[in-house]
């Protein structure tokens, strides 16, 4: 759900790491992104961590921009095909409630890199 240019930058940045782990090639990643956008959630049970699986949903602000994500990680056997849609639906409902409660004037949402810089600068002064 990111703007095209931002999505492409994220893919370019992360692709070497994904390839290094044998996790995804670029075509598979792009296919997974398209599927996630269409269904509204993403699920991975690929063996990155043997026996683990997860599902994640985006959290949108009042303008429909993705600002966060909610996810659940569990044992792969607990996130089976019958249970997965229910877990995704619960996460989606919670993400909508969270998104509706976000303050649109919070500078952290509008300029996350500035907010993180301020936090890091403050921490540097404390150390």
PLM regions and their residue ranges:
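Short, solvent-exposed recognition segments
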Residues: 1-48
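Short capping/connector residues at structural and topological boundaries
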Residues: 20-23, 57, 84
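Juxtadomain coupling helices with adjacent low-complexity linkers
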Residues: 39, 50-51, 68-127
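Sensor-regulatory modules in signal-transduction proteins
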Residues: 59-62
């Amino acid at each position: 759900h990111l703007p095209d240019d931002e999505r492409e930058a994220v893919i370019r940045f992360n692709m070497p790491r994904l390839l290094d782990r044998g996790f995804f090639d670029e075509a598979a990643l792009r296919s997974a992104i398209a599927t996630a956008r269409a269904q509204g959630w993403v699920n991975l049970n690929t063996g990155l961590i043997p026996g683990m699986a997860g599902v994640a949903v985006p959290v949108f602000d009042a303008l429909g921009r993705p600002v966060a994500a909610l996810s659940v990680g569990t044992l792969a056997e607990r996130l089976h095909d019958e249970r997965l849609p229910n877990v995704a639906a619960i996460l989606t409902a919670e993400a909508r409630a969270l998104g509706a409660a976000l303050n649109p004037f919070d500078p952290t949402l509008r300029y996350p890199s500035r907010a993180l810089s301020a936090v890091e600068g403050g921490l540097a002064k404390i150390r």
